[in-house]
Regions:
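A hydrophobic alpha-helical transmembrane-helix feature that marks the membrane cores
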Residues: 1-230
Length: 230
C-alpha cells in the first residue's frame, strides 16, 4: 500500500558558502524553531480533525496544486505579516491531507497505530540527530546544496511515476531516497540558518516542515511494506 506522496520544496542559497556563526543566525534559528513548533501542532490538529471525520484523500493532483499554490503564495508573502498566515494555511492543508493517509494505515494493518507511532518516532530521531550535528559540527555542509536539489527533483519525478504507473518497487526506492535526502536537507538547512545562509525564518520553517512531512510519510510507507497488509 502506498498512499503517501512525497512533496518537494525549492529553497534558496543552494551551495552558498557558510559564514561565521552570528547572533543574527541564532535569532533566525530560534524564530524558525518557534514557528516550526506552532505549525507542527496546527498541522497535527488538522490531521486529527481530518482523520476523525473520515475526510477522503483529495487525490494527488489536488494535493499538489494546493501545496504548490500555497507554497508560491507563502514565498511571495515571506517578508510580510501575511506570510505567517500563509504558512499556517500551507501546513494546515498538508495536515488535512495527512489525516486520510494515517487512517488508511490504521485501517489496513492490525498494528497500524504502532506503525504510525514508529514512523513518528523515527522522524523525531532523524530530525534531532541531524539538527544536533549541524549545531555542533565545525564541518562545512554547504557542498550538499546542489546535490540535494538535484536529488529531490529526481526523487519527486520518480515518485510521481511510481504513483501514476503503479510501480511498487520504484515507490519503495523513492521512499528510501526521500529518507536520506530529507535527513541531508535538515542538516544542510539548519547549518545554513545558523551560519547566515538563510535569513528568512518563514522559508526556513517551510523547508524543515516539508522535510519532516516527507520523512514521516516515507518511513510509514516502508514500515507498511515490511509489515505486510492484513
Amino acid at each position: 500500500m502506498n498512499t503517501n506522496k512525497p512533496v518537494t520544496q525549492t529553497y534558496q542559497n543552494v551551495g552558498s558558502q557558510p559564514a561565521v556563526r552570528t547572533e543574527a543566525g541564532n535569532k533566525v534559528l530560534r524564530n524558525t524553531y518557534m514557528l516550526l513548533s506552532m505549525t507542527l501542532l496546527f498541522s497535527a490538529a488538522m490531521a486529527w480533525i481530518s482523520a476523525a471525520n473520515n475526510w477522503p484523500y483529495p487525490g494527488v493532483m489536488i494535493t499538489l496544486i494546493g501545496y504548490f499554490g500555497l507554497l508560491f503564495l507563502t514565498t511571495k508573502l515571506r517578508n510580510s505579516v501575511w506570510g505567517i498566515a500563509s504558512i499556517f494555511a500551507l501546513t494546515g492543508f498538508m495536515g488535512v491531507t495527512m489525516g486520510p493517509i494515517v487512517n488508511a494505515y490504521i485501517g489496513a494493518f492490525s498494528n497500524g497505530t504502532e506503525l504510525v507511532m514508529m514512523a513518528l518516532g523515527g522522524t523525531g530521531v532523524v530530525f534531532f540527530s541531524m539538527s544536533g550535528v549541524a549545531l555542533v559540527s565545525k564541518r562545512d555542509f554547504s557542498w550538499m546544496g546542489k546535490g540535494l536539489m538535484i536529488g529531490i527533483l529526481v526523487a519527486f519525478v520518480a515518485g510521481l511515476g511510481a504513483i501514476f504507473f503503479q510501480m511498487p518497487a520504484l515507490s519503495l526506492a523513492v521512499s528510501s531516497m526521500f529518507i536520506l535526502l530529507m535527513a541531508g536537507l535538515i542538516l544542510y538547512q539548519t547549518q545554513q540558518i545558523i551560519n547566515g545562509g538563510e535569513t528568512n525564518y518563514i522559508m526556513a520553517t517551510i523547508t524543515l516542515f516539508v522535510s519532516l512531512y516527507n520523512l514521516f510519510t516515507s518511513m510509514l510507507h516502508l514500515l507498511g511494506f515490511f509489515a505486510g497488509e492484513d
